[in-house]
UniProtKB/Swiss-Prot annotation:
PANTHER family (UniProt xref): CROSSOVER JUNCTION ENDODEOXYRIBONUCLEASE RUVC
Protein name per Swiss-Prot or TrEMBL: Crossover junction endodeoxyribonuclease RuvC
Location (main, coarse): cytoplasm
Enzyme class: hydrolase
Oligomer status and interactors: Homodimer which binds Holliday junction (HJ) DNA. The HJ becomes 2-fold symmetrical on binding to RuvC with unstacked arms; it has a different conformation from HJ DNA in complex with RuvA. In the full resolvosome a probable DNA-RuvA(4)-RuvB(12)-RuvC(2) complex forms which resolves the HJ.
Residues binding Mg(2+) 2, per UniProt: E68
Role noted for this protein: The RuvA-RuvB-RuvC complex processes Holliday junction (HJ) DNA during genetic recombination and DNA repair. Endonuclease that resolves HJ intermediates. Cleaves cruciform DNA by making single-stranded nicks across the HJ at symmetrical positions within the homologous arms, yielding a 5'-phosphate and a 3'-hydroxyl group; requires a central core of homology in the junction. The consensus cleavage sequence is 5'-(A/T)TT(C/G)-3'. Cleavage occurs on the 3'-side of the TT dinucleotide at the point of strand exchange.
Length: 174
């Protein structure tokens, strides 16, 4: 059995989703959001994200972590803040000796929905279907679960079934 933590990083809201994989079957464990205080400095927000991810790592002990890659924003300042949030999430996971994998938004959508340009509501719907949930999780948590599902598919060779047109296996980061 493998426990996978999916992370959808953000400086205000970082989504997380935990699934377990056993015999190529996935099951929901937990999901939610780490919300940072609006009135604090960036350094304090980053510490809140770091502490939140560390708490998840301590409680659930995932051995693999999947995180969304940065995409270019129109606003460079937003991209920098997202990069900082992503960085502290990765450091928190790495400090717990988890293997870290990165996927682009297109790869995640392709893996979960079957279409790399899928809309957010399509991704959320497939998360509910694949994990047999009663209702859709919060937006950022649903995205994080999609990232975890994508990693499960990739580690089980979905990329070979889709072919080079769809997605490619990502390098592991330690």
């Amino acid at each position: 059995m493998t426990i996978i933590l999916g992370i959808d990083p953000g400086s205000r809201v970082t989504g997380y989703g935990l699934i377990k994989e056993s015999d190529r079957k996935i099951a929901y464990i937990d999901s939610g959001c780490i919300r940072t205080s609006n009135d604090t400095e960036l350094s304090h927000k980053l510490l809140q994200i770091y502490d939140g991810i560390c708490e998840l790592m301590d409680h659930y002990s995932p051995t693999e972590v999947a995180i969304e890659q940065i995409f270019m924003h129109n606003n460079p300042n937003s991209a920098l803040k997202l990069g900082h949030a992503r960085g502290v999430a990765m450091v928190a996971a790495a400090s717990h000796r988890a293997k870290i994998f990165e996927y682009s938004a297109r790869e995640i959508k392709q893996s979960v929905v079957g279409y790399g340009a899928a809309e957010k509501d399509q991704v959320s719907h497939m998360v509910v279907e694949l994990l047999q949930l009663n209702r859709a999780p919060q937006k950022d948590a649903a995205d994080a679960l999609a990232i975890a599902i994508c990693h499960s598919h990739m580690r089980n060779g979905l990329s070979k079934l889709i072919g080079s047109r769809g997605t490619k296996r990502r390098r592991m980061r330690l």
